[in-house]
Amino acid sequence: MINEIKNDAKSRMEKCVESTKTQMAKVRTGRAHPSLLDTIKVSYYGSMTPLKQVGNVSIEDSRTLAVNVFDSTMIQAVEKAIMSSDLGLNPMSAGATIRIPLPALTEERRKDLIKVVRAEAENGRIAVRNVRRDANSDVKSLEKEKECTEDDVRRTEDDVQKFTDAHIKLIDEILTAKEAELMEV
């Protein structure tokens, strides 16, 4: 039972780290990256479809993305979806390819984005700590039901704390890398 609690806590913490990584990937840096457009959905025959299912997103150069749309009738819809996203991008179509130049980030915008990234990291840390709290309360309830000893509780809490520290350290490393990426000119 205790191993189940530890394994559950570890897998939930890993999901928290992955979620934080995903949220940070959405924050636009000065460099072109295909994952920048992952959140964009296009109206495709009446249903909202992810952009990567209606076209191929690639990097043209360090500041330009290219979207090769599979169905040429979808070019207008894809352009509209990119423009209406909150990324502040202006796509230009050239045949079946849509080019998306990324404007350079101003110093002020970089600082705002760093605040956003730090907030995402803090949300990730909070989620990891909540998992720790849940695991510790589960173990204590086992002790109250006399299904484990006080020593088992202490050992499990120590193990869960080690998981917590390791996952928070991972989130901090992701944050540091993202901040460095944002401050690159």
From Swiss-Prot:
Pfam families: RRF
Keyword Cytoplasm: yes
Chief location category: cytoplasm
Cysteine pairs bridged by disulfides in the record: none
Gene Ontology molecular function, alphabetical: ribosomal large subunit binding
Compartment annotation: Cytoplasm
GO CC entries: cytosol
InterPro entries: Ribosome_recyc_fac, Ribosome_recyc_fac_dom, RRF_sf
Entry keyword set: Cytoplasm, Protein biosynthesis
GO BP: cytoplasmic translational termination
Record PANTHER family: MITOCHONDRIAL RIBOSOME RECYCLING FACTOR PSEUDO 1 (PTHR20982:SF3), RIBOSOME RECYCLING FACTOR (PTHR20982)
Functional note: Responsible for the release of ribosomes from messenger RNA at the termination of protein biosynthesis. May increase the efficiency of translation by recycling ribosomes from one round of translation to another.
Listed HAMAP family: RRF
Protein family (similarity comment): Belongs to the RRF family.
Record-given protein name: Ribosome-recycling factor
Organism: Shewanella sediminis (strain HAW-EB3)
Gene name, Swiss-Prot/TrEMBL: frr
